[in-house]
A protein has these predicted regions:
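Short conserved loop adjoining the S-adenosyl-L-methionine
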Residues: 112-116
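A conserved beta-strand element that flanks and buttresses the S-adenosyl-L-methionine
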Residues: 123
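A short glycine-rich, Lys/Arg-flanked "PGG" loop and its adjoining helix->strand segment in the class I
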Residues: 136-147
Length: 203
């Protein structure tokens, strides 16, 4: 895909778009205590899977994929995001960490995954709640999994705490994931922990 492509065609109608300001903001969200605990939850769970190739859908500034790469060496990873600004920041961070020989970032989306490679693990962290056509996206992603591989979604749930009141539209629930998996005729392995949720779909 052309590196000059602006990614505008990869957003579905109504999906939130992230430019230079948004990408800078997301670069500091890892400092927020709730999100630090969320990232720890994701890292622990990802470590339970066996994989040699990983795709991060909605990789943003690359924090999660690069964190995984920093703790595990024997895999190659690709992060995709429809925001060129996010991809640029992630690529720069990968190069500074010396991980760009095995971790790459490209413009793409859940419905438009660049290349033709399949993956041992595909995951999304704090991106799924933005997707407007979730079922189409899951179908597209499942097609890019190797046999026996997993697509894993990590999100935040409503744990009743005060701060959740301000981000209702960004929250997922067990019921939402169960409804989606039922419509797609897929089995979802759902795990909840301290206000965070993981839904895993196996090919």
């Amino acid at each position: 895909m052309d590196s000059d492509y602006n990614g505008s065609g990869l957003y579905a109608e109504g999906e939130e778009r992230f430019g230079s300001i948004g990408s800078r903001f997301y670069g500091i969200t890892r400092l927020i205590p709730t999100l630090r605990r969320f990232y720890s939850f994701v890292l622990r769970d990802v470590a339970s899977y066996d994989y040699g190739s990983v795709l991060d859908v909605g990789s943003g500034t690359g924090f999660m994929l690069l964190s995984i790469a920093g703790s595990r060496e024997n895999f190659r990873g690709l992060g995709i995001d429809p925001s060129p600004q996010m991809v640029a920041r992630a690529t720069s961070r990968s190069m500074k960490l010396g991980l760009n020989d095995r971790i790459a970032f490209r413009i793409g989306s859940s419905r438009s995954i660049p290349g033709n490679s399949n993956f041992d693990l595909i995951y999304s962290s704090l991106s799924f709640h933005h997707w407007k056509d979730r079922e189409e996206s899951i179908r597209s992603i499942m097609d890019r999994l190797n046999a026996g591989a997993h697509f894993v979604i990590y999100e935040i749930t409503d744990d009743g705490s005060f701060n959740r009141k301000f981000v209702k539209s960004h929250l997922m629930s067990r019921q939402k994931f169960e409804d989606i998996s039922s419509r797609l005729n897929l089995q979802a392995d759902i795990k909840e922990e301290n206000g965070y949720i993981r839904a895993a779909f196996k090919k």
